[in-house]
Amino acid sequence: MLDRIKVCFTESIQTQIAAAEALPDAISRAAMTLVHSLLNGNKILCCGNGTSAANAQHFAASMINRFETERPSLPAIALNTDNVVLTAIANDRLHDEIYAKQVRALGHAGDVLLAISTRGNSRDIVKAVEAAVTRDMTIVALTGYDGGELAGLLGPQDVEIRIPSHHSARIQEMHMLTVNCLCDLIDNTLFPHQDD
């Protein structure tokens, strides 16, 4: 059992090192995309399933409340938090539409959709991205593996942050770290002189 624990930590560290080499440009572009949207009075819609939903919710909470420093609230909505809306849509046998319907209702040109999917193939996330495209929104996608179907939907203005791994647990860990990096970059760009 102790060896297995060491393997988990070693895999995580190796994934972090690979990501630190491969992802800074994409993370920087994503942060600037989010900052630009916020500075123009727009909002960020976030979605994911399972652990990815938790990461989406963490991002939205960090925008609305704060990340590490006190600052004004920033507009972000985690689309996976309203159980009444989610179950109403799913109850009508439209599970694939649970996020897309919300994007069509709440999203506007200039808003950003933060779509988080470990493999990039979750139908409800893919449909949300398709809906965001019809609303002239920009997409920031956190993926892994080969980026899946989601990667193929992105345009030149969109940003994919693809974790260099084929292990779901490592991808999810890196998604959380990436979300924290994005929050840190947003705070330090918009509020550079805030005290800790």
Swiss-Prot record:
SIS domain boundaries: 34-196
CDD domains, alphabetized: SIS_GmhA
Transmembrane segments: none
Keywords: DNA replication
InterPro entries listed in its UniProt record: DiaA, GmhA/DiaA, SIS_dom, SIS_dom_sf, SIS_GmhA/DiaA_subfam
Pfam families in the cross-refs: SIS_2 (PF13580)
Keyword Membrane part of the UniProt annotation: no
GO biological process, one term: DNA replication
Molecular function terms, GO-annotated: carbohydrate derivative binding
The UniProt record lists the keyword Protease: no
Assembly: Homotetramer; dimer of dimers.
Family: Belongs to the SIS family. DiaA subfamily.
Purpose of the protein: Required for the timely initiation of chromosomal replication via direct interactions with the DnaA initiator protein.
Name of the protein in its database record: DnaA initiator-associating protein DiaA
Organism annotation: Citrobacter koseri (strain ATCC BAA-895 / CDC 4225-83 / SGSC4696)
